[in-house]
């Protein structure tokens, strides 16, 4: 069975993306397509700013920080992703970019979609 991670890309307290992500997850859970959907809220992972000396591509999915390791395990368990992200200053929010940059191999070869 494939697993799709629905990633809420904003960490703001009243982020609209959380409402959208929860709605999408509810709709997806009702589908009979043989796909498992899991909601991954960046705010709950509380990922620290990337400052490690070992770049993620060389970390072999083993991270010193337990929060980054938990994030790695959650992302690695997924076969694809739907990113729910706002646009801040013509880009994604900093916490979303940081969360993406903290990992490397976990993303490789997996399809993505954006909302």
Region annotations inferred by a language model:
Residues 102-115:
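Short, acidic/small-residue loops that bind anionic groups at enzyme active sites
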């Amino acid at each position: 069975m494939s697993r799709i991670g629905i990633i809420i890309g904003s960490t703001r307290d009243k982020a609209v993306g959380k409402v959208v992500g929860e709605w999408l997850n509810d709709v997806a859970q009702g589908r009979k397509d043989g796909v498992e959907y899991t909601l991954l809220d960046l705010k709950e992972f509380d990922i620290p700013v990337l400052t490690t000396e070992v770049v993620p591509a060389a970390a072999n999915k083993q991270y010193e920080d337990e929060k980054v390791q938990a994030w790695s395990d959650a992302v690695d368990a997924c076969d694809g992703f739907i990113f729910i992200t706002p646009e801040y200053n013509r880009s994604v929010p900093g916490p979303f970019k940081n969360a993406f940059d903290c990992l490397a191999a976990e993303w490789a070869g997996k399809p993505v979609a954006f909302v």
